[in-house]
Design a protein with these regions (language model features):
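An extracytoplasmic/periplasmic, membrane-proximal ligand-sensing/linker region
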Residues: 26-28, 37, 157-173, 177-194, ...
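C-terminal lobe and pocket-closing loops
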Residues: 207-267
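A bilobed periplasmic-binding-protein/Venus flytrap-type ligand-binding module shared by bacterial periplasmic
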Residues: 111-122, 247-260, 283-284
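Pocket-flanking alpha-helical
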Residues: 42, 59-97, 186-188, 206-211
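Ligand-binding pocket segment of bilobal, Venus flytrap-like solute-binding proteins
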Residues: 75-79, 149-227
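Short, well-ordered beta-strand elements
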Residues: 23-37, 54-59, 147-151, 268
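A conserved helix-loop-strand patch within extracytoplasmic ligand-binding domains
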Residues: 98-150
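Immediate post-signal peptide segment of exported/extracytoplasmic ligand-binding proteins
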Residues: 21-29, 49-50, 140-147, 305-312
Length: 312
């Protein structure tokens, strides 16, 4: 019995020595938004932090207001800062202070008007935006009357599509989807009889593996075309341009993270995902119909060679 007790004591000591120690008793706060890759990625990174001994809580947050929340320390980090959708909010928070640009993903992003390839059969001048406008009547619905219907992203993504339509004099009406899932449902419904459709889309995600398509080519985005009427092809208008065609995808963090959770902060600095990896995260939820937490664990299990070095 004495030998057994000694053995148990030794095992317990080894387990205690091997267990990761929390940087703080307070939880790291991870944000949850309304598109699949971000939700899965938050859980992937959160589980990595948990493997380091830290506690993580997940909170649903507005995808624009989150930068103010991170700046104030109410949310600890943001794993998907898309240049096109959230660059302005991110820059504004950086100027105020309290938030850091921690890392840049390998992924290159694009966010803009997009159509599945069957739409090009109905409007062969695509992807030129003027050709799209000439075909506006083919996208009209009872909801939009004689104007073409563009299905935009959720309102909180702040894509300024209505401003773009007005600036470029397009015969389109913007209708905002309630969620990313509503956009995929629109495409699935249109595919059945090859109805021409133009929607907001972005890369990386899983969609082009299911529905091959193209982005609409608007006047090229240049710095200031969204804020300065003098920049861009229409002299007195802002948003007379597309979104960045090669946008960044960054990671932001509360500046107090490095002192409060130094182990996880060091790991976060090393985190970087490719377009293919992010698309896979979205696919696990949107195609394979996994719960985001399960998708995150599946991704971690299949990709230890990718993320383990981030914790070393």
């Amino acid at each position: 019995m004495r030998t057994s007790n000694k053995l148990l004591s030794c095992v317990s000591a080894l387990l205690a020595a091997g267990a990761a120690q929390a940087d703080s008793s307070d939880p790291i706060i991870a944000p949850i938004h309304n598109w699949s890759s971000q939700i899965v990625m938050s859980h992937v990174i959160g589980k990595i932090f948990e493997s380091q001994g830290n506690h993580v809580e997940y909170v649903t947050t507005d995808s624009q207001a989150v930068y103010e929340s991170v700046r104030l320390g109410d949310v600890t980090f943001e794993p998907e800062v898309w240049e096109g959708a959230f660059g302005a909010s991110f820059r504004a928070a950086l100027e105020k202070g309290g938030i850091e640009d921690v890392a840049t993903h390998q992924a290159v992003t694009r966010e803009d008007w997009w159509y599945p390839m069957w739409t090009k059969d109905a409007c062969p001048g695509l992807p030129d935006w003027q050709a799209l406008n000439d075909c506006a009547a083919k996208f009209a619905t009872p909801e939009t009357g004689d104007k073409g219907r563009f299905l935009g992203g959720p309102v909180d993504w702040l894509k300024h599509d209505a401003e773009k339509v007005e600036a470029l004099g397009m015969n389109f009406q913007v209708v905002n989807a309630g969620s990313a899932a509503a956009i995929w449902a629109e495409l699935a419904a249109a595919e059945k009889d090859k109805t021409p459709v133009v929607v907001f889309n972005w890369t990386p995600n899983f969609a082009e593996a299911v529905w091959p398509g193209e982005f609409v080519n608007f006047p090229e985005w240049v710095e200031g075309c969204d804020t300065d009427p003098a920049v861009g092809p229409v002299p007195d208008k802002t948003f007379d341009c597309g979104n960045p065609a090669n946008g960044y995808l960054k990671i932001a963090a509360w500046e107090g993270m490095k002192e409060k959770w130094p182990t996880s902060y060091a790991a976060l600095q090393k985190v970087t995902f490719t377009n293919a990896q992010i698309a896979e995260m979205a696919k696990l939820v949107d195609i394979d119909e996994m719960e985001p937490e399960d998708a995150a664990q599946a991704w971690l299990d299949a990709n230890e060679v990718v993320w383990k070095p981030w914790t070393e």
